[in-house]
Amino acid sequence: MADWTRAQSSGAVEDILDRENKRMADSLASKVTRLKSLALDIDRDTEDQNRYLDGMDSDFTSVTGLLTGSVKRFSTMARSGRDNRKLLCGMAVVLIVAFFILSYLLSRTRT
């Protein structure tokens, strides 16, 4: 801080006040620069996350379309008659076994 007791004239006081004012202005300018940089980083990160979420939305939309078509075909096959019920049960068993095999293999690769 300024040393007011050593100031001998009004010119010295003005010089001290001017130096302190410049120091505080420089400090404020550096803080503003840091805040601006932080705001720009947040903006960039937000835009990246929005792009990522838009991509996920389109992925989920396409997966929903695929699953809807599969469910319709599966339902049509189930309603088509008794002969297909054996096939339907066989497919269900194969899918369940495949699920357990894949989960086992994935658990082994992670450990």
Swiss-Prot record:
The lineage of its organism: Eukaryota, Metazoa, Chordata, Craniata, Vertebrata. GO terms for cellular component: cytosol; endosome; Golgi membrane; Golgi stack. It is found in: Golgi apparatus membrane; Golgi apparatus, trans-Golgi network membrane. It comes from Mus musculus. Vesicle SNARE required for targeting and fusion of retrograde transport vesicles with the Golgi complex. Required for the integrity of the Golgi complex. The gene is Bet1l. Disulfide bonds: none annotated. It is a single-pass type IV membrane protein. Residues 1-86 are cytoplasmic. This is BET1-like protein. Residues 15-77 form the t-SNARE coiled-coil homology domain. GO terms for biological process: protein transport; regulation of retrograde vesicle-mediated transport, Golgi to ER; retrograde transport, endosome to Golgi.
